[in-house]
Amino acid sequence: MPVTVTRTTITTTTSSSTTVGSARALTQPLGLLRLLQLISTCVAFSLVASVGAWTGPMGNWAMFTWCFCFAVTLIILIVELGGLQAHFPLSWRNFPITFACYAALFCLSSSIIYPTTYVQFLAHGRTRDHAIAATTFSCVACLAYATEVAWTRARPGEITGYMATVPGLLKVFETFVACIIFAFISEPLLYNQKPALEWCVAVYAICFILAGVTILLNLGDCTNVLPIPFPTFLSGLALLSVLFYATAIVLWPLYQFDQRYQGQPRRSMDPSCTRSISYIQPNTVCFWDRRLAVSILTGINLLAYVSDLVYSTRLVFVKV
């Protein structure tokens, strides 16, 4: 099956940085980096699991992140060592860097969320010490995954898979930010009484699905099944997402913080943000903070989609 690849930004690092099907793959720079990822995530979840310091949604997220990253990194190492790239069900041009980008973002979020919403409320002692150490190893893992992305991303003039290009990596970032937005708007009371806010939620969902479909098409080498050329699909998707997010960046803050639309311009006006409630439920985020976070994340994703649109026009596609 012909594969759509891009000429513009990459070094195909899997072939140049590792020796396929050999134990020497672990002694190459990329192999050593993946060993560091494997060890740091393993130590992180082991430290937390040994003292049970992962109860509640924030602790569960951190534990999931470290276990998931450890498991997938182990699979990648096994495939590299066994020379099984041709038998892997997903595109090996696109899968490792896609995972590395997601893993870097996952570990970054855990390295921030876990200590700020969970560890600081633990009593001083062995449990807290283990949690702090786990956070440190999470930071190490984040840096290791980010380094892999920097090493394996596309370089100008080279041929590689789409996910190694700037637009491909931006797709990963866009879906990750959308997932964070979904976490903040998980309480329907934030939006279900105003059609404008419901539209914003629809925007987040539609753009997330479209970006996710793009990633899956590339991971499955299925870009040729589209009824339109893949470059046209990418440009249209980026333009549509920019237009949608442009409406959300106006409507969400307007209806959440403007008193003319029953919004709350000040944090003190939100009963869920009172100090007594925050003390009783330290791991929760009050409604006003959620609204502000979604506003900021909407702006961040809008910038990402604008960059995606600009970079997508600079890609040159070839068939191999």
Swiss-Prot record:
Transmembrane domains' residue ranges: 35-55, 61-81, 95-115, 131-151, 165-185, 197-217, 233-253, 292-312
Location in or out of the cell: Membrane
The keyword Nucleotide-binding is annotated on this UniProt entry: no
Domain MARVEL residues, every copy: 25-157, 162-317
GO BP: any one term: intracellular signal transduction
Superkingdom: Eukaryota
Pfam families: MARVEL
GO cellular component: cell-cell junction; cortical actin cytoskeleton; membrane raft; plasma membrane; ruffle
Signal sequence interval, chain numbering: none
Record has Transmembrane as a keyword: yes
Topology class, membrane: Multi-pass membrane protein
Keyword annotations: Membrane, Repeat, Transmembrane, Transmembrane helix
PANTHER family given in the database record: MYELOID-ASSOCIATED DIFFERENTIATION MARKER (PTHR17068:SF3), MYELOID-ASSOCIATED DIFFERENTIATION MARKER MYADM FAMILY MEMBER (PTHR17068)
Family to which this protein belongs: Belongs to the MAL family.
Name of the protein in its database record: Myeloid-associated differentiation marker
Taxonomic source organism: Mus musculus
